[in-house]
């Protein structure tokens, strides 16, 4: 220890630069040597025990808790993208914090700098600002505490009801479940919309795309589906409950506010989470919102519960991702989208799954929404998402303006796996309906040219017109599956063939009121059995025949 101290003293006493040795320097070195000799002699006089006690005291008193943070500096900032020098060990998609308090996410890891997307207004950041790593990949709060709340893409409450009390958190970019934990779709996810539940049934764990032009009723189908779950969520059976997450991407704030009010009025907000990244939010937040909502839904799926997530809409997420990618100088591809835009949506939608019993038996059902331009379903993003999903509900402007609402094109709409989940009662009544409607559309095109139609063709046209009328349904008025079965039964069994098409809607409303008030036992039997037994069939036939006789009179 003495030799170390001697060496240190000599080093301090020697001149800093060897090239500057002069007479003065030599003189100072002699003085240093003399001082060193004096201090050395003093140390020798001090007892060894005393030296060791002083050293021990110094070592024990030293502050060993050194808090090291890796930091960098902003080289340039603009359009929501910060180029940061430093942060050599930063991870991809790691959250970083700017000196202004704003958060960002590292996306481009380059040799000399890091490309960071900013979650907020980049005017608060200036060149030279310090950026520090947080060491955490972007995560959001999850759990039942979020039900009934409106949050942003990072899970912060934006509804003015105070902070969210959730203690659990999940990363937003989790990997989708593999093949082994999954099981085929087998339970129905009832939307309450006749045209969907009968012709394009959706199962729990399915991905069903809702696609169409703007203002064709895409969001209405999604909202009706959420409202319809009230009949299951008000019960006590956890296996029947379906928790809902609605992700609004790039929409107007007024639209989101109206939607929240509609859900509140229908008493559906208590089992719903709304994740909002509006048009005025930064592009990175619009990109992140679907993944955040998905993580919230996965909490229910992985705890043996059932959840439904609606992405409204993924076209705007793709546009936000394109903006970010181009500003990060990534090479553009078709329609200027980056090369990994397919992966952007596939890694999100693959997280919807029906888990097997060994993994809790939960499910996450996804209803992504895509907006088309002038009905062009062959554009880049629509074809991508169609190929990823398990079917699509195609909405047409032409049908919408004809008054056929929901404006579902039954020919182009398909559900690839949902028929396995359809209830037997609905299969019994709706089995022939899709074929009859397809034949009707085919014949209707030729019927415009000639009046000499045979009886069979006229019958097809007559039935098709009435079934089309029967599938019309008002907004925000979902129906229970047993009520749908009773109404569709009257149509497909030919009881309405003599009724004027203009009177179909009036008949439906009156018939439903009659069945609900007078024949509740029959509806309960259909709901409990899940099928139409011979006894129920005979009873339904009698009810429809008697009611029609009174209705027409």
Swiss-Prot record:
The protein's name: ATP synthase F(1) complex subunit alpha, mitochondrial
Pfam families cross-referenced by the UniProt entry: ATP-synt_ab, ATP-synt_ab_C, ATP-synt_ab_N
Modified residues (N6-acetyllysine): 123, 126, 132, 161, 167, 230, 239-240, 261, 305, 427, 434, 498, 506, 531, 539, 541
Organism this protein belongs to: Bos taurus
Location(s) in or outside the cell: Mitochondrion inner membrane; Cell membrane
Keyword Heme: no
Domain of life the protein comes from: Eukaryota
PTM sites of type Phosphoserine: 53, 65, 76, 106, 166, 184
Chain positions recorded as ATP binding sites: 215, 217-220, 473, 475
Subunit structure: Homotrimer. Component of the ATP synthase complex composed at least of ATP5F1A/subunit alpha, ATP5F1B/subunit beta, ATP5MC1/subunit c (homooctomer), MT-ATP6/subunit a, MT-ATP8/subunit 8, ATP5ME/subunit e, ATP5MF/subunit f, ATP5MG/subunit g, ATP5MK/subunit k, ATP5MJ/subunit j, ATP5F1C/subunit gamma, ATP5F1D/subunit delta, ATP5F1E/subunit epsilon, ATP5PF/subunit F6, ATP5PB/subunit b, ATP5PD/subunit d, ATP5PO/subunit OSCP.
Record's function text: Subunit alpha, of the mitochondrial membrane ATP synthase complex (F(1)F(0) ATP synthase or Complex V) that produces ATP from ADP in the presence of a proton gradient across the membrane which is generated by electron transport complexes of the respiratory chain. ATP synthase complex consist of a soluble F(1) head domain - the catalytic core - and a membrane F(1) domain - the membrane proton channel. These two domains are linked by a central stalk rotating inside the F(1) region and a stationary peripheral stalk.
Keywords of the record: Acetylation, ATP synthesis, ATP-binding, Cell membrane, CF(1), Glycoprotein, Hydrogen ion transport, Ion transport, Magnesium, Membrane, Metal-binding, Methylation, Mitochondrion, Mitochondrion inner membrane, Nucleotide-binding, Phosphoprotein, Pyrrolidone carboxylic acid, Transit peptide, Transport
Reported tissue expression: Heart muscle (at protein level). Heart and liver.
Comment field (misc): The siderophore enterobactin (Ent) produced by enteric bacteria binds Fe(3+) and helps bacteria scavenge iron ions from the environment. As a consequence, the mammalian siderocalin LCN2 plays an important role in defense against bacterial infections by sequestering iron bound to microbial siderophores. LCN2 can also bind iron bound to endogenous or nutrient-derived iron chelators and plays an important role in cellular iron homeostasis.
Topology class, membrane: Peripheral membrane protein
Presequence extent in this chain: 1-43
Alphabetical list of NCBIfam families matching this protein: atpA, PRK13343.1
GO molecular function, one term: proton-transporting ATP synthase activity, rotational mechanism
């Amino acid at each position: 220890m003495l030799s170390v101290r001697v060496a240190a003293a000599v080093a301090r006493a020697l001149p800093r630069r060897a090239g500057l040795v002069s007479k003065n320097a030599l003189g100072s070195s002699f003085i240093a040597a003399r001082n060193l000799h004096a201090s050395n002699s003093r140390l020798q006089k001090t007892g060894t025990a005393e030296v060791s006690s002083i050293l021990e005291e110094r070592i024990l008193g030293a502050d060993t808790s050194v808090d090291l943070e890796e930091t960098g500096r902003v080289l340039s900032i603009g359009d929501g993208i910060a180029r940061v020098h430093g942060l050599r060990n930063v991870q991809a998609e790691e959250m970083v914090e700017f000196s202004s308090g704003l958060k960002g996410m590292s996306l481009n890891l380059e040799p000399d700098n890091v490309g960071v997307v900013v979650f907020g207004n980049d005017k608060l950041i200036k060149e030279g600002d310090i950026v520090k790593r947080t060491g955490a990949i972007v995560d959001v709060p999850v759990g039942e505490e979020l039900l009934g709340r409106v949050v942003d893409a990072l899970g912060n409450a934006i509804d003015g009801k105070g902070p969210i009390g959730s203690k659990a958190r999940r990363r937003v970019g989790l990997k989708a479940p593999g093949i082994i934990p999954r099981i085929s779709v087998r339970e129905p996810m009832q939307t309450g919309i006749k045209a969907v539940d009968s012709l394009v049934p959706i199962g729990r764990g399915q991905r069903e795309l809702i696609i169409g032009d703007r203002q064709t009723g895409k969001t209405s189908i999604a909202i009706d589906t959420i409202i319809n779950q009230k009949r299951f969520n008000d019960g006590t059976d956890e296996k029947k409950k379906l928790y809902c997450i609605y992700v609004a991407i790039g929409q107007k704030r007024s639209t989101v506010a109206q939607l929240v009010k509609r859900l509140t009025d229908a008493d559906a907000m208590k089992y719903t989470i709304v994740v909002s990244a509006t048009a005025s939010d930064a592009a990175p937040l619009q990109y992140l919102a679907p993944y955040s909502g998905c993580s919230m839904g996965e909490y229910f799926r992985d705890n043996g519960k059932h959840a439904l997530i609606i992405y409204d809409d993924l076209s705007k997420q793709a546009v936000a991702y394109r903006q970010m990618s181009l500003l990060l100088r990534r090479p553009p591809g078709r329609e200027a989208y980056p090369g990994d835009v397919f992966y952007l949506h596939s890694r999100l939608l693959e997280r919807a799954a029906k888990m097997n019993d060994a993994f809790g038996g939960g499910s996450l059902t996804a209803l992504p929404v895509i907006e088309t331009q002038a009905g062009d379903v062959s554009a880049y993003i629509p074809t991508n998402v169609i190929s990823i999903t398990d079917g699509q509900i195609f909405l047409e402007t032409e049908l919408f303006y004809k008054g056929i609402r929901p404006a579902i094109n039954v020919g182009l709409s398909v559900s690839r796996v949902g028929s396995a989940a359809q209830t037997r009662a609905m299969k019994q009544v709706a089995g022939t309906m899709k074929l009859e409607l397809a034949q009707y559309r085919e014949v209707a095109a030729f019927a415009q040219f000639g009046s000499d139609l045979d009886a069979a063709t006229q019958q097809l046209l007559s039935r098709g017109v009435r079934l089309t009328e029967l599938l019309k349904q008002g907004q925000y008025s979902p129906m229970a599956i047993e009520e749908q079965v009773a109404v569709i039964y009257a149509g497909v069994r030919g009881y309405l063939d003599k009724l004027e098409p203009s009177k179909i809607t009036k008949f439906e409303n009156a018939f439903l009121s009659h069945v609900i008030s007078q024949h509740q036992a029959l509806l309960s039997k259909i709901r409990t059995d899940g099928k139409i037994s011979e006894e129920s069939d005979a009873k339904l036939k009698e009810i429809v025949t008697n009611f029609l006789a009174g209705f027409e009179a």
